[in-house]
C-alpha cells in the first residue's frame, strides 16, 4: 500500500506542531487518598514535522497514548519518547485536560462529598523534558471594600484560581488545590447542611479577599513550599453585583 504521508515534500517548510486534538480518552491519574483515580481526559497530541516529509501518521498518536497505563510525570515523559519514535520526530507535545474529584468533609457536620477540580498536564520534549501541571480551583471570596462601607453584609461570590507550575519535586494535585483554598475567603463544598452554611458564611465575612489579595496569598504560599520553580496564577472573580468579572494575573520564577 502506498504510504502517502511519507512522500517527499518539495516545499521545504517544517511544521512546529501537527497532530490530533479533542480526543476524549479514559485515563488513570495519581490520587493522594486512593492511590489512583479514573477520569476522562480531552487530549491534544502533536509532533514536529520535518520540511521534506508530506504528512504525519495521525493514528500513531493514538497508538502511543493507548499504551499509557497511569498518567504521571515519568509516564508522560515516556509517552513523549514513544511519540517521537513512532513519528520519527525531534520534538513531541501532549496536553491532558480532565476533571479530578477530591473528597471533602464539611467544617461542622463532617458531611463527605466530592468536589470537582478541572486539571491539566501540559508537556513537551525535544532534548529536554518540560512538564507543567495546572489546576482550576473554585473558591469563595468576599469583598473587603463592601464589608468596610456597609452597615451589614458584604457582596461575595465564587472565584476561580488557576495555578500552573513547574515543579522541582513532586506535588499532589490536592496540595495545589489546598494552596488556592487556604488563600481564599473560604473553600467551597458540594454539600452544605445548615450548620456548615452558617460556618462558611461567617468564615468568609471574617476573611475578606480582593482578587489581588487572593493572588498574592497564593504566590506567598507557593514560595514557602519550596517544591515549585516556576508559576503562573490567574484569579477570576465572578462578580455578584457587577455585569463584569474581576481578575488578577502573575507569573514568575522561584529561585530559592
UniProtKB/Swiss-Prot annotation:
GO terms assigned for molecular function: GTP cyclohydrolase I activity
Keywords: Hydrolase
Reaction catalysis annotation: GTP + H2O = 7,8-dihydroneopterin 3'-triphosphate + formate + H(+)
One annotated GO biological process: tetrahydrofolate biosynthetic process
InterPro entries: GTP_cyclohydrolase_FolE2 (IPR022838), GTP_cyclohydrolase_FolE2/MptA (IPR003801)
Feature type site, description May be catalytically important: 143
Name of the top EC class for this enzyme: hydrolase
Enzyme Commission number(s) of this protein: 3.5.4.16
Pathway(s) served: Cofactor biosynthesis; 7,8-dihydroneopterin triphosphate biosynthesis; 7,8-dihydroneopterin triphosphate from GTP: step 1/1
Segments crossing the lipid bilayer: none
Family: Belongs to the GTP cyclohydrolase IV family.
NCBIfam families: PRK13674.1-1 (NF010200)
Function of the protein: Converts GTP to 7,8-dihydroneopterin triphosphate.
Protein name (record): GTP cyclohydrolase FolE2
Amino acid at each position: 500500500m502506498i504510504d502517502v504521508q511519507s512522500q517527499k515534500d518539495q516545499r521545504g517548510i517544517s511544521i512546529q506542531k501537527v497532530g490530533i486534538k479533542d480526543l476524549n480518552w479514559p485515563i488513570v491519574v495519581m490520587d493522594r487518598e486512593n492511590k489512583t483515580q479514573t477520569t476522562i481526559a480531552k487530549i491534544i497530541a502533536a509532533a514536529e514535522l520535518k520540511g521534506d516529509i508530506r504528512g504525519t501518521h495521525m493514528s500513531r498518536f493514538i497508538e502511543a497514548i493507548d499504551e499509557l497505563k497511569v498518567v504521571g510525570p515519568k509516564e508522560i515523559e515516556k509517552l513523549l519518547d514513544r511519540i517521537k519514535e513512532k513519528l520519527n520526530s525531534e520534538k513531541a507535545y501532549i496536553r491532558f485536560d480532565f476533571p479530578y474529584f477530591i473528597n471533602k468533609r464539611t467544617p461542622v457536620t463532617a458531611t463527605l462529598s466530592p468536589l470537582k477540580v478541572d486539571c491539566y498536564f501540559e508537556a513537551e520534549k525535544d532534548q529536554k523534558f518540560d512538564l507543567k501541571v495546572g489546576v482550576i480551583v473554585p473558591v469563595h471570596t468576599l469583598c473587603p471594600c463592601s464589608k468596610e462601607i456597609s452597615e451589614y453584609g458584604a457582596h461575595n461570590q465564587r472565584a476561580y484560581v488557576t495555578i500552573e507550575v513547574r515543579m522541582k519535586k513532586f506535588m499532589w494535585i490536592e496540595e495545589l488545590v489546598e494552596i488556592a483554598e487556604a488563600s481564599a475567603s473560604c473553600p467551597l463544598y458540594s454539600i452544605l447542611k445548615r450548620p456548615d452554611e452558617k460556618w462558611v458564611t461567617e468564615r468568609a465575612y471574617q476573611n475578606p479577599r480582593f482578587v489581588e489579595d487572593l493572588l498574592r496569598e497564593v504566590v506567598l504560599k507557593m514560595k514557602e513550599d519550596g517544591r515549585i520553580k516556576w508559576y503562573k496564577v490567574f484569579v477570576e472573580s465572578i462578580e455578584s453585583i457587577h455585569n463584569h468579572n474581576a481578575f488578577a494575573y502573575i507569573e514568575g520564577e522561584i529561585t530559592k
